[in-house]
């Protein structure tokens, strides 16, 4: 069940024509929350172009590079259901500004960390901050979205996707201009947004609107058999999609570095791919009101995999780069739809349901990076990346079994 704004939309709501001639009322606070999502996730996007640098600096193997993704998964993803249960039960809103601040401070110091163990420790703690933001951000978004939660969730998701997209280019150009040791400066923008949220966020109002009617528990979330089946399918679908996306983000930069491609090229490729996916997700979320969500999720799975495999087969080269950008776009545009579908089958636990999609399934995909790195060492990076690209096809049957609408 998604909590909706009751009564009239906020006085200063943004109004725009809807798909069916209706009006979309979105609270301006939603854009501030989306901005926090942008800066929360921009730091997570730093690591894509940094993998080759860190690999050389600390003398890492492919499996050890995969371990970085595993640490990210454990901290920022698998912990999200715990944060989701906490926020559903107590309605904590301070995480919307404290979490991005913690992430910014810890992750921005990667350039001055002297050892691999300390690097992993800082990454782990910084990713915990990122994890604390997502469940609450996703659960308050429908409340701030008026009568069109699909549009609101797309705006919220686009903030994170654009941040994750900007991360590779920002860190690549920053390091090229000022050096790896200057990265602590990058914590400043997130601190400013956190301060704005602290001053402007209507914390009491949001806490009241999103408070559950009953005590939130894991047992309660999975009490309904039909809802449980849908949630498990959604988790599996997002897991398969995320294996492809995380595999692309983890290992393709290493492959590009082996081909002597510059750091800025790596950053630009991933920024274009993720930014396009964020933009398309807003359109797709609006379109879902006409087509239903299931068909668009199926397109994301069934079309994204062939594009990814084709991109790997033709890379490097213009055709391969274009296919990879298209693959990343198609694989990620269904994320807001999956979150909303999970919330609608969550009872009184929207934050916990959101965390299953944004965190738990993402984390499981991160754990898969270590064995995939081992496979790459055995059969080579190109062969392993083809396997990664085809992975979403495992979710086709689960897509077909989702409820219509």
Kindly give the residue locations of the regions a language model identified:
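A late C-terminal transmembrane helix in Major Facilitator Superfamily
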Residues: 348-379
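Helix-loop-helix hairpin linking two adjacent transmembrane segments in secondary transporters
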Residues: 156-202
């Amino acid at each position: 069940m998604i909590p909706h704004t009751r009564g009239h939309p906020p006085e200063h709501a943004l109004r725009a024509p809807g798909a069916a001639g209706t009006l979309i009322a979105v609270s301006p606070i939603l854009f501030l929350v989306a901005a926090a999502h942008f800066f929360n996730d921009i730091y997570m996007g730093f690591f894509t172009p940094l993998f080759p640098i860190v690999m050389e600096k600390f003398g890492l193997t492919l499996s050890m590079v995969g371990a970085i993704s595993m640490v990210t998964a454990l901290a920022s993803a698998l912990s999200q259901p715990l944060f989701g249960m906490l926020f559903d039960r107590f309605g904590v809103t301070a995480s919307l500004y404290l979490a991005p601040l913690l992430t910014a401070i810890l992750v921005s110091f990667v350039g001055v960390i002297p050892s691999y163990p300390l690097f992993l420790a800082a990454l782990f703690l910084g990713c915990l901050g990122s994890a604390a933001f997502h469940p609450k951000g996703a659960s308050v978004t429908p409340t701030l979205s008026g009568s069109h939660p699909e549009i609101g969730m797309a705006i919220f998701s686009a903030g994170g996707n654009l941040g994750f997209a900007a991360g590779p280019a920002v860190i690549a150009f920053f390091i090229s201009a000022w050096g790896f040791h200057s990265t602590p400066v990058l914590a400043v923008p997130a601190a400013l947004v956190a301060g704005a949220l602290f001053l402007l966020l209507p914390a009491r109002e949001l806490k009241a609107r999103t408070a559950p009617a009953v005590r939130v528990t894991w047992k309660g979330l999975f009490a309904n058999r039909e809802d449980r089946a849908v949630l498990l399918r959604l988790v599996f679908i997002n897991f398969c999609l995320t294996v492809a996306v995380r595999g692309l983000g983890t290992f393709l930069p290493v492959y590009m570095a082996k081909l002597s491609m510059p750091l800025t090229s790596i950053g630009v490729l991933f920024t274009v791919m993720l930014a396009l996916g964020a933009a398309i997700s807003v359109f797709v979320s609006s379109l879902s009101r006409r087509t239903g969500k299931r068909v668009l999720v199926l397109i994301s799975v069934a079309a994204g995999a062939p594009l990814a495999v084709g991109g790997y087969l033709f890379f490097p080269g213009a055709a391969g780069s274009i296919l990879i950008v298209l693959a990343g776009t198609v694989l990620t545009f269904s994320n807001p739809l999956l979150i909303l579908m999970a919330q609608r089958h969550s009872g009184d636990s929207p934050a916990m349901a959101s965390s299953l999609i944004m965190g738990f399934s993402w984390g499981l995909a991160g754990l898969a990076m270590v064995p995939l790195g081992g496979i790459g060492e055995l059969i080579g990076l190109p062969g392993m990346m083809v396997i990664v690209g085809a992975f979403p096809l495992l979710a086709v049957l689960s897509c077909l079994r989702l409820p219509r609408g």
